[in-house]
């Protein structure tokens, strides 16, 4: 069975490797163009391209697929049975969706129809969801509205960051899409069910500004945001005129004026919130490395009563 693969980041690279390891023929891999990255802004290949080249696969990097006759012709010439799409980042027009014999399967990191859109992992943590998961979806022209082929649940742990949930769902998604491809190969079809009309939510793209901590919110809400926005865009506060990223924190039952430092020690930097307080245990000063609060407090002293 011939499988086109389309994806860009690590989440997708894991799936590509799994599909290849399962023995499926992959005549073409689509990924986004190389982009400048890092402090030196060096042109860097996306993880999917790196994985594809290691596997000896053909790679194409079109800037767009919509109104791109050359890319469409390339897809048609492959005569693929199915396309697997994972965090590709480009819109697939209807003519692309229709090109493979069995259409396009998408690996989506939520329990659809909850958290359709760009940032499902982060929004699930931010909202305090007890669980999330992966859906393998038969793609249609809508935004994550296609029929669901399979659903795989994951319990969000109380200390899980977006990075940790990402890594867990990355492995779940890779195994899930291989299982569904094997079913398609053996039976010649997939049993997909329509998404419920109720329970639809949208996972809007993250912004740096929304990651700025508002101390008037409850400590529980802020703590979830810290985990949801870790590693990027990273929850932050202004400290000495510069942004300081907050990496880990926990809720404590203390009270004070919102944004007021209640104590600073090797155990934690405690800041009052709209309800309860937050004990910060790991942070990252502007231009510096991540550090635990003991290392931070050793070189700085923040007086109780200071406003953040």
UniProtKB/Swiss-Prot annotation:
CDD domains: FMT_core_Met-tRNA-FMT_N (cd08646), Met_tRNA_FMT_C (cd08704). It comes from the Bacteria. Keywords: Protein biosynthesis, Transferase. It is an enzyme of class 2 (transferase). It holds the Pfam family Formyl_trans_C. GO terms for cellular component: cytosol. PROSITE patterns: GART (PS00373). One of its GO terms (molecular function) is methionyl-tRNA formyltransferase activity. The keyword RNA-binding does not apply. Attaches a formyl group to the free amino group of methionyl-tRNA(fMet). The formyl group appears to play a dual role in the initiator identity of N-formylmethionyl-tRNA by promoting its recognition by IF2 and preventing the misappropriation of this tRNA by the elongation apparatus. Belongs to the Fmt family. This is Methionyl-tRNA formyltransferase. The lineage of its organism: Bacteria, Pseudomonadati, Pseudomonadota, Betaproteobacteria, Neisseriales. The gene is fmt.
